[in-house]
């Protein structure tokens, strides 16, 4: 059995590596080549955001394709660039824009993995006769009695399992994550040892089609005329100000509301207000005190369940945002393909459009998209101590 789990020699095992031009996927390809595998590199041309916003410099830019090709030449593997712009636009970018217009806060990287990399690219890898598709994700694929399971990456600071929750069992069977057991520092050290020019390349910080994080500009260009001004309204009905479009607000947001407020002589905000909900139909942004954000019940749709036959009242920990710690909860699947998540402690700022990802220990049991969060009757009637719960 070789290191990728196949009962044949590495040189007889063909591996397609998804090469983004970054250090993680470059090290993945180089390590597999060093181990003797038949490696083929593929880079996806997903989006030229310069056509939309007139700027350069994010993970899908031409420089990254050049970097991937340089690495492929260095380690002497075939390398192909596939034009996936059209399918990426339809499957990811349009969904991103429409999600914001619905008052949600989307995660396009999950949709990209779900609808492009692990669907279309995986099919392309099969067409090339590959035994598996390898990526540079910091996640682990662990063999189990009923098939492979998805686990967190070994480095908590780099774990990307949250973004992979939609991976199906069939996809997971074909995927490999060769650096999922490494810390990032070791990945960069390997890049240095292997002589890869990308060893010191900075990690991408932006969504590839949203340069400098200006997602509102992208949505406005993709959906001209759809972003309309409206009112900022307090829960008690007072109109506190106006906004330039609900796409600029997310549940739990405190800064940048532009409605002023009382402050201490030292400048500290008194009675701060938070976005409690976004109403795209009325074009209203509703704000209130932090206590109004308390929620302990989360409704989820499009659940991908990797947890086997247990589907009712399953004890889990759940992440409601990628950078948030996992929280104790219980989850029950529903007949419509969704789930109800009951939190042990109320949370503040649970945003529709984000993902709820379920874990048992390091294992990913699945996840889905947050539709809305609610306060149970018990929570709604209970006084909430100041500072209780976790701010998202």
UniProtKB/Swiss-Prot annotation:
Binding site for ATP: 18-25, 44, 136
Gene Ontology biological process terms from the UniProt entry: tRNA wobble position uridine thiolation
Gene3D superfamilies: Adenine nucleotide alpha hydrolases-like domains, HUPs, Translation factors
Localization in the cell: Cytoplasm
GO cellular component: cytoplasm
Xref: Pfam families: tRNA_Me_trans, tRNA_Me_trans_C, tRNA_Me_trans_M
Disulfide linkage: 112-208
Feature type site, description Interaction with tRNA: 137, 354
Reactions accelerated catalytically: S-sulfanyl-L-cysteinyl-[protein] + uridine(34) in tRNA + AH2 + ATP = 2-thiouridine(34) in tRNA + L-cysteinyl-[protein] + A + AMP + diphosphate + H(+)
Single GO MF annotation: tRNA binding
InterPro entries xrefs: MnmA-like, MnmA-like_C, MnmA-like_central, MnmA-like_central_sf, Rossmann-like_a/b/a_fold
Keyword annotations of the record: ATP-binding, Cytoplasm, Disulfide bond, Nucleotide-binding, RNA-binding, Transferase, tRNA processing, tRNA-binding
SUPFAM superfamilies: Adenine nucleotide alpha hydrolases-like
Region span, Interaction with tRNA: 158-160
EC number of the protein: 2.8.1.13
Subcellular location, principal: cytoplasm
Catalytic center residues: 112 (nucleophile), 208 (cysteine persulfide intermediate)
NCBIfam families named in the record: PRK00143.1 (NF001138), trmU (TIGR00420)
Family to which the UniProt record says this protein belongs: Belongs to the MnmA/TRMU family.
Cited function: Catalyzes the 2-thiolation of uridine at the wobble position (U34) of tRNA, leading to the formation of s(2)U34.
Protein name as catalogued: tRNA-specific 2-thiouridylase MnmA
Taxonomic lineage: Bacteria, Pseudomonadati, Pseudomonadota, Alphaproteobacteria, Rhodospirillales
Gene designation: mnmA
